[in-house]
Amino acid sequence: MKLTHSFIKQQARLGLNFFRYLLARMNHDRVNVNAGYLAYITLLSMVPMLTVLLSILSSFALFANAGEVIQDFVITHFVPAAGEVVKTALIEFVANTGKMTAVGGAFLFVAAIMLISNIDKNLNYIWRVQQKRRAVFSFSMYWMILTLGPILVGASIAATSYITSLKILDNEALSGVYNLFLRWLPFVLSYCAFVGLYLLVPNKKVHWQHAMLGALIAAILFELSKKGFAAYITQFPSYQLIYGALAAIPILFVWVYLCWLIVLVGAEVTAALGEREHWSDSQDMLHFAPLPKNEKE
């Protein structure tokens, strides 16, 4: 009994030390400031990124209608409230890019690359990565994300459409299972995306257990924030009263900021789990790993 009590007390102290270290680490890394910076970059790069992704999808006959399906799915499940307004605006913006020249198209591609590059830099900063990737390797990785990413998404959409068309779904039991699968699909996709982000982006080895736990926390926070944000927008429509038809702009900015805040918090959790030697309730708790060289200069 004494052993059990001692073990529980030890684990509670360890958890408290981790939580204190995590808060100090996030404050040190200015997570809230970096989330705002990434939100700003995302809003500037959103249309270029969508244009590049949809143009890649449209080049394959198999994925001819995948673009619209992806837009509907993302808006419905990942952008709470004001979804139709945001969708209409994005479709208009993307449609206007069809009138651009080759130089304009190149600019869109560069803007999309810049977004991925900034995500890469911020996450590597959280993991205190000292050695940067070579430029050729980084560009190859960004290119792979922009090309293979849409193809994989399009393939999954095509597979889902094929499964939906099967007659076996007329069975009531199978139909219930399929509906349950669709209900949990957004959470599963978010979780898998966070795991991949925390495992693959940092230029150092990340333990998969840490990445899975950090991704789980981020995915749960993301789902809770979706419901909470949607409830706030519908119950307290102050943005609509103040901004009127332009209400979608601040709503979208706040939502993108929340998304990046959650991504960075999950990254901080994942990185902190690998720094157990710093979990201490002493004054040395803030002994962080050294900053990247470019941050020292």
Swiss-Prot record:
Intracellular or extracellular location(s): Cell inner membrane
Pfam families: Virul_fac_BrkB
Membrane topology, record value: Multi-pass membrane protein
TM regions (residue ranges): 43-63, 100-120, 135-155, 181-201, 213-233, 245-265
InterPro entries: UPF0761_bac, Virul_fac_BrkB
Similarity section: Belongs to the UPF0761 family.
PANTHER family per the UniProt record, alphabetical: INNER MEMBRANE PROTEIN YHJD, UPF0761 MEMBRANE PROTEIN YIHY
Protein name: UPF0761 membrane protein VC_2742
